[in-house]
């Protein structure tokens, strides 16, 4: 089978990747296991810096998952203390800068002239992309780490306590609330909902995937993706902390911690295939390939139709890779030492590497064509261009 890169790239919002920490713990800067040393390789692509900017004081000691967002020719970025900036995607010139009176904790979502974000205080804020002015603020049940997700009418927000709140996109008024039971111990962070016009797909810390009717918030179906096993609470963690990925033909791909990757038929939840890969990252689909970053930072390419493994790269094992992005035929990742890595999507070979900042990269890159925007933990936002 060949990888058809001309097909639409199925990318989902990346700022929702959960940190590999237990709830209530502070973030650390290094992996628990010894990461592989970087090795030399035959470079087939180069990463050239186009511009860089400093976004406040970065992601904070807890490494809040405040991934940037891009719409059109503007990049939006924030720091953990409430600074939000809009930058020209081509040259990094600042378009505006606002200081919110509350600490930011979620990735940003930029859509239809608005920027949406969540805070540590359980607020959701909508900003006007033109000048950063606040359109509305709404209160949800608890801290928000997952990027708010929108369809034409609603903004869906998943809080760290597992509650899902639907807000009116135009006004912030609450439309409905869905609550779920949480295990005693969970990973730090939550899954990010996948929202389409009729329904919302929600991954929960108890290992269940729930499909909610967007008219009412009532469940249409739910499925146990990951089943707790083992004696200790840590062994029994089964969080669905990545974002489900849906394709135009109605397939749904879901990752889970300590469990498996599952392909489902989206309307009823019937299982198409499953693969025994543990992942807390959002997967990426390009052409006929599904790319998964495992919990030990191996990168695996699966046949999206059958689940068969096509290739596996362990060169970056235990380097705390971010969720994948895609640029100019390559997968793009950040790591805990602040490197950006390229892996050839067809072959699985290392293709390029550049270092952004030694503070590390814990949020997924944002890409547009052959352009990569990546925000380091200290707040440095760097734009790189991939060239063969």
Predicted segments — roles?
Residues 88-91, 128-131, 168-172, 214-217, ...:
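Short loop/turn segments that connect beta-strands within beta-propeller blades
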Residues 29, 33, 44-69, 96-111, ...:
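Extracytoplasmic beta-rich repeat domains
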């Amino acid at each position: 089978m060949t990888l058809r890169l001309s097909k639409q790239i199925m990318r989902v919002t990346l700022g929702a990747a959960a940190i590999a920490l237990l709830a209530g713990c502070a973030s650390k800067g290094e992996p628990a296991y010894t990461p592989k040393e970087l090795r030399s390789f035959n470079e087939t692509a180069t990463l050239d810096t186009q511009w860089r900017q400093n976004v406040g004081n970065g992601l904070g000691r807890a490494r809040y998952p405040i991934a940037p967002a891009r719409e059109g020719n503007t990049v939006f970025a924030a720091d953990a203390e409430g600074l939000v900036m809009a930058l020209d995607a081509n040259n990094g010139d600042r378009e505006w800068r606002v200081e919110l009176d509350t600490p930011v904790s979620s990735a940003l979502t930029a859509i239809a002239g608005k920027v949406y974000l969540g805070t540590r205080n359980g607020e959701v804020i909508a900003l006007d992309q033109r000048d950063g002015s606040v359109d509305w603020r709404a209160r949800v049940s608890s801290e928000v780490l997952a990027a708010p997700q929108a369809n034409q009418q609603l903004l869906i927000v998943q809080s760290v306590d597992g509650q899902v709140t639907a807000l009116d996109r135009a006004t912030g008024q609450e439309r409905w609330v869905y609550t779920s039971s949480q295990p005693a111990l969970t990973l730090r962070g939550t899954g990010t909902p996948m929202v389409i016009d009729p329904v919302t797909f929600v991954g929960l810390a108890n290992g269940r995937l729930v499909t909610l009717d967007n008219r009412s918030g009532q469940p249409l179906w739910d499925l146990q993706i990951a089943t707790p096993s083992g004696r200790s609470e840590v062994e029994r963690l089964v969080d669905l902390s990545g974002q489900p990925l849906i394709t135009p033909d109605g397939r749904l791909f879901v990752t889970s911690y300590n469990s498996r990757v599952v392909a489902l038929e989206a309307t009823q939840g019937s299982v198409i295939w499953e693969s025994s890969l543990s992942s807390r990252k959002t997967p990426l689909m390009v052409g006929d390939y599904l790319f998964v970053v495992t919990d030990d930072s191996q990168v695996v390419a699966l046949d999206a139709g059958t689940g068969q493994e096509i290739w596996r790269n362990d060169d970056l094992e235990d380097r705390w890779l971010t969720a994948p992005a895609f640029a100019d035929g390559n997968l793009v990742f950040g790591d805990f030492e602040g490197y950006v890595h390229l892996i050839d999507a067809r072959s699985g070979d290392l293709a390029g590497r550049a270092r952004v900042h030694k503070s590390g990269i814990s949020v997924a890159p944002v890409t547009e064509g052959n352009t990569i925007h990546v925000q380091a933990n200290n707040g440095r936002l760097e734009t790189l261009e991939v060239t063969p």
